[in-house]
Amino acid sequence: MGTRQELVTYLWTDIINTYLRDDALDNIVAHCRRRPADPFGDSGPAIERLLAAGASRSDLRLILRATAYEAVFGTLYAIGDPGVDNDNVLMLHEELLTADPSGLEGRPGSADAL
């Protein structure tokens, strides 16, 4: 990554707006079917239940997009204030799942454990 502008452009196009694609929900469901015990493996069945209950695919994608924005914004804000000692953020993404307070690293049932 290069400049600040390149970073925020990447985050917007490749993280936030990825949920606007028509196949976004199908990709999540398919991944969860292949690997149901993986972190957030329970999100695919949740999407299927919402669709079966009549939720609009477009509305669900908008909710996912807004959630992604809030997550990116909150992360960038936290990195800036309060920050990380010695700006030690390299490879921080590898530690994210270990911070799940349920101890399940985001796997199915982790939301229920809170």
Regions found by a protein language model. Give the residues of each.
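Amphipathic alpha-helical interaction modules
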Residues: T18-A68
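Polybasic, proline/glycine-rich intrinsically disordered low-complexity segments
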Residues: M1-V29, N86-L114
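Amphipathic protein-protein interaction modules
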Residues: A46-G103
